[in-house]
Amino acid sequence: MKSKKAAAIMLCAVLGTSMATGVSVSAKDKDELVLYTWDGMFPQEVLDDFEKETGIKVVYSNFDTDETMLEKLSQAKGGDYDVVIADDYIIDSAVKEGLVQKIDKDTVSNFKNINPLYQGQFYDPDDEYTVPYGAGIPLIVYDPEQVDIDIKGYKDLWDKSLEDSIAIVGNYRVICGITQLSMGESMNEEDVAVIDKTGEKLKELAPNIRMIQDDNTQNALLNGEASVAFLYTSQVTQALKDNPDLKVVYPEEGLGFGIMGMFVPSEAPNAKAANEFINYILEPEVSAQCINYIGYYNTNKAADDLVDESLVVPDSVTKGEIVQNVSQEAEQEYNKIWTEFKAACD
């Protein structure tokens, strides 16, 4: 998720916690736990407090991309690391390759705190192997001073009053996906006929598109170039920080989101400590510290009242879907309709 959204807040200078950058570290000592994830994923005090409470020292090792993580974990045959945090799609691959062990639910009793919206996902349908850490949710944000309609869902983006006024991110599967949600279809549709209908629907949106841009898309909203934007999580956070009067829309058709999940590798040197750490992270106060620090959406319902309200999905939102891999034929069709859509926007 960090690689997709470039939303990392760099980790502070390390105080009392070992750091290894992009390398495999093996914790031989049962009083050590090797944590493997992106840089900047935890406030230092959370790691320090875990050591104070348990006597277990956290050895923090980081990777730059999900693919790097999977390669390192494969080379280690599921060993070397105790807790890994990565994106949903790569966790799916790790589970299928036998590199992940089941969570000890007796130890991880705080799993009950996880918002049901984020449970039972495609990569772990029975919630046996992973625990959500945070979610990335691209959302519609608009300036109510510049927009004459009350935007409630994706379908409203097609309103004629929004001609040449919408800025969107450039992730083709996400944009195709929200178009499908507006049509009452799945974001992961593989039927070519339905994908073609999605393409036609997208072309109808083209007159309303002001720009397609992945980086700093929120700036178009903030400087008045666009009055509506569809933004990544970090961009939503930045937009609201700079202009609290902007409105955020949780689309009535349902959310499209991605999840960062915690898991214990199949041959983790210190699996007991790993499960203790995951349970500790799920304590409401600890979880709130982490979410407020990284700026992703809260997946721990017990922490909702402790988290910045802009990072909490309303209780009224009960539907969501994650973009998944599709067949090669479907993928080619998605690329085709995206190319045609961009041409129509020019």
Model-flagged regions — what are they?
Residues 1-33, 345-346:
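Short, low-complexity disordered leader/linker segments with a strong preference
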Residues 28-93:
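Early extracytoplasmic/lumenal segment of secretory-pathway proteins
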Residues 69-70, 91, 154, 217-220, ...:
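Short, hydrophobic alpha-helical packing/hinge segments within bilobed ligand-binding/sensory domains
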Residues 80-81, 85-208, 213-222:
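Extracytoplasmic ligand-binding site segments that recognize negatively charged/polar headgroups
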Residues 91-93, 228-245:
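A ligand-binding cleft/hinge motif common to bilobed small-molecule-binding domains
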Residues 196-204, 242-266:
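Periplasmic-binding protein-like
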Residues 256, 260, 265-323:
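Mature extracytoplasmic/periplasmic domains
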Residues 307-346:
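Extracellular/periplasmic bilobal clamshell ligand-binding domains
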